[in-house]
C-alpha cells in the first residue's frame, strides 16, 4: 500500500505525515508538495528539512503559474467564494499527478485537517473518489496548533517564520484570495511588497473587466460589498478600524470549486 501525504508546508501536514510514518513505516510514504510559485522562501526550506527529518521521499509538482497569472488567464479574480487558483494550481495539478502515478486500490491519500475541522472532511473524500482519503490529525491524541508547533521544535525543526509572524498558515507567501481583513493587514505589515503586488493585480482586473470586484467583501448595514486592498490599505494608514479577527484563509484541497 502506498501512502501519499499532501504536504503544504504547514505544521498540521507535518504532524499528519509523522503519524502516517509512525503507523506504516517510511518506505511507502511520499510527501507531495504542490507549488503555487509564490510560496515564502522559508516554506521551501521547511518542506525540505521536514522530508529529511521524516526520511521520506518528497515530490514537488507545479502547474508553473502563480495565482495572479491564473486570475488574468481566467479573467476572474479569486475571492472568498470561488478560488480558481486553488482549483487549477492545487487540485487539478495534484489530480493529474495522482491519477497518472497511482492506483486507487493500493493508494491512500492523507490531508492535514485536524479534529476541529471534521465538517470539512466530506468534500475531499467526494472530490478524490475513487481514492481513499484519511485525516490523521482528526484522531486522538487531539492536538492544537500550539501543540503541533511544539512537535516541530521537539523534532529539531525551525518553525516556519510565517507562524512566528502570526499568520494562520504557511501557504502562498501569506497571500490568499480567501483571506479576510485581519490576514491581509498582516500581509501589509510584514510583506508590503507582496501586498502591493496583490493590490495592483486587483486594481488592474477591476479596470480590465470594468467590474466592482475584489478579493474581500465587507458588510455595510448588513449588506456584503466589495472591499478592495486599496481601501484596506487606506484604512490601515488612516488608522481607521478594521476587523482584525476576519482571518479567512486557505481552503485548498478542501473546498471543491
Residue ranges and their predicted role:
Residues 1-257:
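Nucleotide-activated chemistry modules centered on ATP-dependent adenylation/adenylyltransferase
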Amino acid at each position: 500500500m502506498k501512502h501519499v501525504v499532501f504536504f503544504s508546508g504547514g505544521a498540521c501536514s507535518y504532524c499528519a505525515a509523522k503519524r502516517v510514518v509512525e503507523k506504516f513505516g517510511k518506505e511507502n510514504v511520499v510527501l507531495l508538495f504542490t507549488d503555487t510559485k509564490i510560496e515564502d522562501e522559508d516554506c521551501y526550506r521547511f518542506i525540505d528539512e521536514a522530508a529529511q527529518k521524516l526520511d521520506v521521499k518528497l515530490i514537488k509538482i507545479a502547474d508553473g503559474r502563480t495565482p495572479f497569472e491564473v486570475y488574468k488567464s481566467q479573467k476572474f479574480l479569486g475571492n472568498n467564494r470561488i478560488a480558481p487558483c486553488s482549483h487549477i494550481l492545487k487540485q487539478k495539478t495534484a489530480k493529474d499527478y495522482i491519477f497518472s502515478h497511482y492506483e486507487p486500490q493500493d493508494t491512500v491519500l492523507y490531508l492535514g485537517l485536524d479534529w476541529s475541522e471534521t465538517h470539512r472532511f466530506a468534500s475531499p473524500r467526494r472530490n478524490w473518489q475513487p481514492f481513499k482519503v484519511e485525516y490523521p490529525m482528526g484522531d486522538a491524541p487531539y492536538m492544537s496548533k500550539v501543540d503541533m508547533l511544539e512537535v516541530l521544535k521537539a523534532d529539531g525543526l525551525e518553525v516556519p517564520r510565517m507562524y512566528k509572524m502570526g499568520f494562520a498558515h504557511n501557504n502562498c507567501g501569506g497571500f490568499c484570495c480567501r483571506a479576510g481583513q485581519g490576514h491581509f493587514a498582516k500581509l501589509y505589515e510584514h510583506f508590503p511588497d507582496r501586498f502591493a503586488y496583490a493590490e495592483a493585480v486587483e486594481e488592474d482586473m477591476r479596470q480590465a473587466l470594468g467590474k466592482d470586484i475584489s478579493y474581500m467583501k465587507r458588510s455595510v448595514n448588513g449588506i456584503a460589498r466589495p472591499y478592495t486592498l486599496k481601501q484596506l490599505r487606506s484604512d490601515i494608514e488612516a488608522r481607521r478600524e478594521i476587523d482584525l479577527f476576519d482571518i479567512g484563509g486557505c481552503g485548498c484541497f478542501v473546498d471543491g470549486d
